[in-house]
Each structure stands twice: as C-alpha cells, then as structure tokens.
Regions:
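Exposed, low-structure sequence patches enriched in small/polar residues
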Residues: 34-36, 48-343
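Aromatic-lined, polymer-binding surfaces characteristic
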Residues: 1-45
Length: 343
C-alpha cells in the first residue's frame, strides 16, 4: 500500500496504490481472487473564506479477469454561509469495480444528490434559528437503460433552540424499484413483495434535547406508506453519562407494518442497551446488547481495550448471538483478540 500526498494552501491531492496478492499455492482460490489492485487520485479543495469546499476522485481496480467498467469516480461541492447552504454530489461506480480492502455497497450505478438549506435567524427568547431544507436524490442503472432504482424528494423543517434542543419535521416521497422479491417481515412462509416500482410518502417528527447535558434523549415518530402497505414507527434513545468514567444508553425502535392480503403484517422491535466504562487513560470496557424479534435474535458484544503505548492497543472481544426463545443454544460464540503496535 503506497500513498503520495501533496497539499498546497487550500488544495490537497492524494495519489495511492493498493495491492492485494495471493502468496503460496491453493486450489481453493479462483483466478479472480489471485490479486486485486486499486489505484487512484483524490483531490480536495477549499476557498480561503471556507465558504466553498469540494472534492473529486477517480479510482480504478485491476483483477486477473479484465473488465471494462472497473472504475469508481465522483465529485462533490459544498457552499455554506450564515443564511444559505448548498450541497451537491455525483458518483458513478462501474459494475466491474472491485476493492478487496474496502466495502462497496452498490455497483453499476449512477447517483446524484442535491440539497439546499435556507436558514432564518429569529430574534426570540428561546429560538435561535429556523431552517428549511429541500433535497433530491436518485440512483440509476446505466447498463439497464438508466433504470431508476431509487428516487427521493424530501423537505426538512427544523427549529433550533438556544438551549441547543432541536425539533425537526421531515416529509419525504421516496421511490424504490425492487429488482428481486422482498420478504419484509422475514417470517417463514410469508409471501414476499413482488418485483416492481413503489412510491411510499412518509412523515417524521423528531425532538432531541441538549446533547451536552449529562442526561440526553431523542424521540421520533413516523407514519406513511411502505411499498404496497403502511408503516407507523416510533423510536427513542436515552443516554446518561458520568464524566469521565461511565456512559450508558438505550435505543428502542418499533415499526408496525401493515400490508394488504395475502401479504403478512408484523410489529418489529429493536432494543439495544449500551454500557461503557473508562477505568483510566489506558483501560476501557464497552458492552453492547441487541435484541430483535426478527428471527428472535439476541446479540452480546463485550470489548476490553488496553492502550499500552501511543496509538497501540490490545483488544479482547467476546461475541455471543442467541435465539431469544432458547438462550441455552448459542448461534455464534467467539472470543477474539487483536494487537496493534505503532512503531
């Protein structure tokens, strides 16, 4: 892995080359897995007054099997002032682009996103400012006659209080094209939603208090269509901390999905408590539990971190995943350790 970085004033250029190649002989590895090489350039820029900023990149991958569309490229531009904010992004990823040392969510797509924010500064005792933010996003498949896979028109209305609390009202009108059948409830025997395009407008209202306080909370309710049915949601997050030794939080979300017959209807729960301890500047312990009634799964993750030298850590991680209806039969149980040392 090699990098070459050059920064001048408010511009920065990064040229990189990453090589992953098989060592030794193994009949279990096919030709495409023998090696993977990615090279490219990233270019970042910013104006002197910091109102304008942006970046562009071009990456290309090389494998044993030659591909014509093994690229990933994009550009984004941001303008931000006291009253206005504009952000635009364009990304194109070829179907043949591969990066073994990274995660590529979707390939063979063209994506565009644009957002405009207008801020109004209010001279009142409690309100700091009000903002209205319309946005538009769409994703197409160029190799399928530019078939629209996702499209979303949305508008957000926010009130920011001087207490640092926030009230947000969001309306969105998304469109999704399902290129394969989708079992929403994931129940055995449930009839999946068929292939096709779906519009499902929805409305969300959320409120959070001052996140600098020792006790913080966030609540959100939502309602709208969901593919060929409806969905009503509620979400809450509660957090408490005793600086600098203790932090805990609880995430709860519930989605009530109603689909027309013969499709299934379900109430989906997700509960996730988290507890973190900081014993000193070198020893940390974090614990995370998650329960979901999708598959009746219960997961436990516990990680102990020891920073024995600057930027050098030893991790001991315990994972346990259960079927909640029978906690004595673990699905996955593991104990892992990781050592990193900075020379």
């Amino acid at each position: 892995r090699k990098y070459c970085c050059s920064c001048t004033g408010f511009r920065c250029k990064l040229i990189f080359f990453i090589n992953r190649e098989k060592t030794g002989n193994s009949n279990l590895i096919n030709d495409q897995e023998k090696f993977n090489r990615v090279f490219g350039v990233d270019y970042n820029l910013r104006s002197k007054n910091s109102k304008w900023s942006g970046s562009l990149f071009y990456h290309n991958s090389i494998d044993e099997i030659k591909k014509d569309d093994s690229y990933s490229t994009g550009i984004n531009l941001l303008y931000n002032s006291r009253n206005h904010g504009v952000y635009s992004k364009i990304i194109s990823i070829g179907e043949g682009f591969e990066s073994d040392l990274g995660f590529i969510r979707r390939k063979g797509i063209f994506k565009q996103y644009i957002r405009y924010e207008r801020r109004f500064w209010i001279e009142t005792e409690k309100i700091s400012n009000i903002s209205i933010t319309p946005s538009f996003r769409y994703i197409t498949k160029p190799n399928k006659n530019s078939l629209i896979m996702d499209r979303d028109f949305s508008t957000s209305f926010e009130i920011n209080f001087k207490s640092l609390s926030n009230l947000s009202i969001d309306f969105s009108y998304p469109y999704t094209y399902l290129d394969s059948e989708f079992n929403v409830t994931r129940k055995d025997g449930a009839i999946p939603i068929p292939i096709g395009g779906y519009n499902y407008p929805n409305l969300e209202i959320s409120f959070r208090n001052n996140f600098f306080k020792e006790f913080t909370y966030f609540f959100e309710v939502g309602s709208g269509q969901f593919f060929n049915g409806t969905k009503n949601s509620i979400q809450a997050k509660l957090a408490y901390r005793i600086e600098p030794i203790f932090q805990t939080s609880l995430n709860i979300s519930y989605d009530k999905i109603k689909l027309p017959k013969p499709y299934d209807t379900a109430g989906l729960w997700l509960v996730g408590p988290k507890i973190n301890f900081t014993f000193n500047k070198k020893l940390f312990w974090s614990n995370y539990i998650q329960y979901s009634n999708i598959g009746e799964s219960l997961g436990i993750n516990s990680r102990l971190q020891w920073r024995f030298a600057p930027l050098s850590d030893f991790y001991l991680v315990y994972n346990d995943n259960y079927i909640a209806s029978n906690i004595f039969v673990p699905k996955v149980r593991s104990l892992n350790f990781k050592l990193s040392y900075w020379f």
